[in-house]
From Swiss-Prot:
PANTHER family: GLYCOSYLTRANSFERASE, UDP-N-ACETYLGLUCOSAMINE--N-ACETYLMURAMYL-(PENTAPEPTIDE) PYROPHOSPHORYL-UNDECAPRENOL N-ACETYLGLUCOSAMINE TRANSFERASE 1. Its main location: membrane. It comes from Geobacter sulfurreducens (strain ATCC 51573 / DSM 12127 / PCA). UDP-N-acetyl-alpha-D-glucosamine binds at residues 10-12, 124, 165, 193, 248, 293. It is found in: Cell inner membrane. It is an enzyme of class 2 (transferase). Pathway: Cell wall biogenesis; peptidoglycan biosynthesis. This is UDP-N-acetylglucosamine--N-acetylmuramyl-(pentapeptide) pyrophosphoryl-undecaprenol N-acetylglucosamine transferase. One of its GO terms (molecular function) is UDP-N-acetyl-D-glucosamine:N-acetylmuramoyl-L-alanyl-D-glutamyl-meso-2,6-diaminopimelyl-D-alanyl-D-alanine-diphosphoundecaprenol 4-beta-N-acetylglucosaminlytransferase activity. The keyword rRNA processing does not apply. Keywords: Cell cycle, Cell division, Cell inner membrane, Cell membrane, Cell shape, Cell wall biogenesis/degradation, Glycosyltransferase, Membrane, Peptidoglycan synthesis, Transferase. It is a peripheral membrane protein.
């Protein structure tokens, strides 16, 4: 069988697609996968290094822009649609999966015109504009969080979770088997691959209020390149034991090590921390489209599987107080971590591939 995966732009869209591709290829050595994205998206940098085939088309957003920009976006959509039809005719996929991002729309619309089975996967609590539009032409809609179900037709929507790449799943399993080797309280702070400037600043402001816990607090803080020197200086000035890095190579090891995590609330982060069963203080990125990170975090909060501080209420003292309270309440930390792990769907990629393959058999 052949699977075409369309979309990307960001890691939050692309990496679930890679996880599905891994599962699909593992089913049969004869299976083939082709990605369709854009030259500007993260897929153009990541996929060539992984060995996956990638075809790039022209695509752009049209939402919330002026009339001229919308006209240009529509022209690019039509051009991308024509490119997608050509790719579909040449690759002749049995299945097409849209994972969100600009390239999804023209590709799935072209697949509809050619009567190829179509599926979409939504990673966030509030669906993106592209997936809301494509829901009308999709044969099945896979969702990561229950909250997004209301945006889609009930009879076509299936809760699968957010697929994690095999590398992450294997690292998590390996990390769980390792002993940590000390009795300190380990705090992990990170903001995605580029870091999160506001979290970096606020953590520095929180340090004076955490001085009483300095003796047993061990911190790993991933800052991104821009704030690395300033954050390192802040920890040194306050006398804290901290491993401050621009980028973390093995997130699974970092998760294993942590008793508590301070982080953003992107869909991939949620999938990974729940897979590891780790309690988190989520600080949602306030400028995410439709404020979806806040809704992602609230999805865990209402299930007792995480804590949330919104940026409008964030300060050094507020963050320090939250950390102190949780350091002093190990039973609560354990309960929240267990609740998070109950929400994990380690079989998300399997569930999606199962459903796509089963759908084609029904048509036969």
């Amino acid at each position: 069988m052949k699977l075409l995966i369309a979309g990307g732009g960001t890691g939050g869209h692309l990496f679930p697609g890679i996880a599905v591709a891994e599962e699909f290829l593992a089913r049969d050595k004869q299976n083939e996968v082709l990605f369709v994205g854009t030259w500007k998206g993260i897929e153009a940098r990541v996929l060539p290094k992984t060995g996956y085939r990638l075809e790039c088309i022209t695509a752009a957003g049209i939402r919330g822009k002026g009339s001229l920009a919308r006209a240009k976006g529509l022209a690019k959509f039509l051009y991308g649609y024509a490119q997608s039809r050509k790719i579909l005719k040449e690759f002749r996929p049995d299945l097409v999966l849209g994972v969100g991002g600009y390239a999804s729309a023209p590709t799935l619309m072209a697949a509809r015109g050619m009567q190829i089975p179509r599926f979409i996967h939504e990673q966030n609590a509030i669906p993106g504009f592209t997936n809301r539009m494509l829901a009308k032409v999709a044969d099945k809609i896979f969702i990561s969080l229950e909250e997004s179900r209301t945006y889609f037709p009930e009879d076509k929507t299936l809760l699968t979770g957010n697929p994690l790449r095999r590398q992450i799943l294997e690292q998590v399993a390996l990390a769980e088997s390792r002993e940590r080797g000390d009795d300190a309280f380990h705090l992990l702070v990170f903001g995605g691959s580029a870091g999160a400037h506001r979290i970096n600043l606020t953590m520095g402001e929180a340090l004076p209020s955490l001085k009483e816990a300095k003796g047993r607090l061990r911190i790993t803080h991933q800052t991104g390149e821009n704030d690395l020197e300033d954050v390192t200086a802040a920890y040194e000035e306050q006398g804290f034991t901290a491993d401050v890095v621009a980028f973390i190579d093995s997130m699974a090891d970092a998760y294993r090590w942590a008793d508590l995590i301070v982080c953003r609330a992107g869909a991939t982060t949620l999938a990974e921390v729940t897979a590891c069963g780790k309690p988190c203080i989520f600080i949602p990125y306030p400028h995410a489209v439709d404020d979806h990170q806040r809704r992602n975090a609230e999805s865990l909060l209402k299930r007792g599987a995480g804590f949330v501080i919104i940026e409008q209420e964030l300060s050094g003292e507020v963050l320090a107080q939250a950390i102190r309270d949780l350091m002093d309440d190990p039973a609560r930390l354990k309960a929240v971590g267990e609740a998070a792990q109950e929400l994990a769907r380690l079989d998300a990629a399997q569930a999606i591939v199962d459903e796509m393959v089963a759908s084609t058999r029904k048509e036969e």
